[in-house]
Amino acid sequence: MIIHPQFDPVLISIGPLAVRWYALSYILGFILFTFLGRRRIAQGLSVFTKESLDDFLTWGILGVIFGGRLGYVLFYKFSDYLAHPLDIFKVWEGGMSFHGGFLGVVIAIWLFGRKHGIGFLKLMDTVAPLVPLGLASGRIGNFINGELWGRVTDINAFWAMGFPQARYEDLEAAAHNPLWAEWLQQYGMLPRHPSQLYQFALEGICLFAVVWLFSKKQRPTGQVASLFLGGYGIFRFIAEFARQPDDYLGLLTLGLSMGQWLSVPMIVLGIVGFVRFGMKKQH
């Protein structure tokens, strides 16, 4: 079993100011978005100009931050924040939702498109290939922080990783499983899936490769965005089987996690959109 290195979440600290790895992962994601966006402009495969790309980035950042935070509040810990509403503003304590951030970016795309006279689906198609590497960067941030770890796996599995940060969850899990209790007593922690790395590979690298390559040719309007939508939903749904469910939610109906249920509409809309838009002539 590999032991998580327990990286210091703070990269640089100068007096009261601290630069955290997780914040850096977001910044890297926005840099990658801009870099890929400029490549697409140079290839003639974008509705952006260099100036409008920089303008949209501001809209996108606001969509990610506000949507991600609001999504976390509504989807994951609504009752807690309802009891302590001021905690919503404590973003430094963590708590962001991809699905909320996605909805925030969709709203930003709609508003930006209206302002600049760009069709919503055309703009979605342009933005979609630029996003996955940013998601990959975010998952590396999760791994460095030692958060969002995976479910318990076999002690002899080559991928098994112990997370010292999961001490409380390990104790709770071992209390209901004699074999896990034995492992915990012997090794001091339980072997878990490094699910952050699975999500890095699936939602980040694989999704980027699929959407980027598919969008290198002109496609029917809406089809690239649909591929991203369905692709992310499928990869996230799969990865969630290895990810530890949120302790304050657990597994929901049919034994699925909140992340899986939120991904189901993405999968359905993505598949329907991909087929429907693909049947239309390119325009």
Swiss-Prot record:
Gene Ontology MF: a single term: phosphatidylglycerol-prolipoprotein diacylglyceryl transferase activity
Name of the encoding gene: lgt
Residue ranges of the TM segments: 17-37, 56-76, 92-112, 117-137, 194-214, 222-242, 255-275
Keyword flag Transmembrane helix: yes
Identification of the protein by name: Phosphatidylglycerol--prolipoprotein diacylglyceryl transferase
Pfam families (UniProt xref): LGT (PF01790)
Keyword Membrane listed: yes
Entry membrane topology: Multi-pass membrane protein
GO biological process, one term: lipoprotein biosynthetic process
HAMAP family found in the cross-reference section: Lgt
UniProt similarity note: Belongs to the Lgt family.
Entry's localization field: Cell inner membrane
Residue sites binding a 1,2-diacyl-sn-glycero-3-phospho-(1'-sn-glycerol) per the record: 139
This protein's GO CC annotations: plasma membrane
Keywords in alphabetical order: Cell inner membrane, Cell membrane, Membrane, Transferase, Transmembrane, Transmembrane helix
Organism of origin: Neisseria meningitidis serogroup C (strain 053442)
Intrachain disulfide bonds: none
PROSITE patterns per record: LGT
Matching InterPro entries: Lgt
Enzyme class, spelled out: transferase
EC number(s) from the headed UniProt entry: 2.5.1.145
